[in-house]
Swiss-Prot record:
Designated name of the protein: Tryptophan synthase beta chain
Pathway where this protein functions: Amino-acid biosynthesis; L-tryptophan biosynthesis; L-tryptophan from chorismate: step 5/5
Family annotation (InterPro entries): Trp_synth_b_CS, Trp_synth_beta, Trp_synth_beta/beta-like, TrpB-like_PALP, TrpB-like_PALP_sf
Species this protein is from: Actinobacillus pleuropneumoniae serotype 5b (strain L20)
Catalytic function, reaction form: (1S,2R)-1-C-(indol-3-yl)glycerol 3-phosphate + L-serine = D-glyceraldehyde 3-phosphate + L-tryptophan + H2O
Listed EC numbers: 4.2.1.20
Length: 396
């Protein structure tokens, strides 16, 4: 695999573990990506869409009430304000433009929470590309507002009835479709995972999150934060936040995986800290798997974090100790979801609530510590209000 233009590995993680038929397709994608990155016209069009269609830059908001009684300053990077309601829109615009540049006439994608599906549907509507979204049947049920949004924007949503009917099954179906239709079709992967060049490409199309955050925090506080905190499922919002801070050794990078019903129950989605390295979804990375290599079911209250693996760059950052990965339970995330709504008037996505919950935990552990924290508020919580309502009002 040494004949790729970019390094397909992060340390031992990553690579291109796909059927032989897809190797030239991935290499063609890598070539197109490298050419686009070096093309001022492509960059100008991407930047214009981010600004005038998606609404970048997004705000960096100081929490006025959540930190009362402590010496912490807590800022939120407001990806929830982006068109589409989450950070997903950033890289989807990049990939959709790239697909168009490559002459692809059809887009496919997988989605869990439905946010990536919505972002793909809106980009395809705007760029006039037909799109098919694969979504686990279980997720179609728990994310009905997003399913309606996708269909409203002209996407075909296919509920996947196989396996656990969740995100991992949607990924497998999308990969199958791509292997059959790669000549006309671009598979628009929704996270910084999968075979090379996807993890690198998605990071590059998301890294403005951290770049903007750095500029904004220096403007407001005249210094870098002590830590940036982001939720980790596949890992795209987190790598988008971390990328520009990796070289800033004074800034702690904290990724928050879902502990679900508690790590000890086995019902979680924390492969980085509680999985083993294996091959899945076209890459070598930590996976939740049985001793004989069967992929285990991941679980999280948040559909977008319910993924049994993680992007290879996070695995690498964890292995060298540059980033710290922790986990937060459903209950802790729900508490943070309510706290932000009640005290700041912002309803966060359940995914983002995991990152917020860990920040609140840090503050509670040491209220007298003067610290500057930034949480990546990766998406808004409209899609989750029915789930939360069910739980708070005595449902399951």
């Amino acid at each position: 695999m040494s004949d790729t233009l970019l390094n397909p590995y992060f340390g031992e993680f990553g690579g291109m573990y796909v059927p032989e038929i897809l190797v030239p397709v991935l290499k063609q994608l890598e070539e197109a990506f490298v050419a686009a990155q070096n093309d001022p016209l492509f960059q100008a069009e991407f930047t214009d869409l981010l600004k005038n269609y998606a609404g970048r830059p997004t705000a960096l908001t100081l929490c006025r009430n959540l930190t009362k009684g402590s010496k912490t300053k807590l800022y939120l990077k407001r990806e929830d304000l982006l068109h589409g309601g989450a950070h997903k829109t950033n890289q989807v615009l990049g990939q959709a433009l790239l697909a168009k540049r490559m002459g692809k006439t059809r887009i496919i994608a997988e989605t869990g929470a439905g946010q990536h599906g919505v972002a793909t549907a809106l980009a395809c509507a705007m760029l006039d590309l037909p799109c098919v979204i694969y979504m686990g049947a279980k997720d179609v049920e728990r994310q009905s507002p997003n399913v309606f949004r996708m269909r409203l924007m002209g996407a075909e949503v296919i509920p996947v009835q196989k396996g656990s009917c969740s995100l991992k099954d949607a990924c497998c179906e999308a990969m199958r479709d791509w292997a059959a239709n790669y000549e006309t079709t671009h598979y628009l992967i929704g996270t910084a995972a999968g075979p090379h060049p996807f993890p690198t490409m998605v990071r590059e199309f998301q890294k403005m999150i951290g770049e903007e955050t750095k500029r904004q925090i220096l403007e407001k506080e005249n210094r870098l934060p002590d830590a940036v905190i982001a939720a980790v499922g596949g890992g795209s919002n987190a790598i988008g936040m971390f990328a520009d801070f990796i070289e800033e050794k004074s800034v702690q990078l904290i990724g928050v995986e879902p502990a679900g019903k508690g790590i000890e129950t086995g019902e979680h989605g924390a492969p980085l800290k509680h999985g083993t390295t294996g091959i899945y979804f076209g890459m070598k990375s930590p996976i939740m798997q049985t001793k004989d290599g069967q992929i285990e079911e991941s679980y999280s209250i948040s559909a977008g974090l319910d993924f049994p693996s993680v992007g290879p760059q996070h695995a690498y950052l964890n292995s060298i100790g540059r980033a710290e990965y922790v986990s937060i339970t459903d209950q802790e995330a729900l508490d943070a979801f309510q706290a932000l709504a009640q005290h700041e008037g912002i309803i966060p996505a359940l995914e983002s609530s995991h990152a917020l919950a860990y920040a609140l935990k840090l503050i509670a552990q040491n209220p007298d510590k003067e610290q500057l924290l930034v949480v990546n508020l990766s998406g808004r919580g409209d899609k989750d209000i029915f789930t939360v309502d069910k739980i708070l009002n005595g449902g399951n």
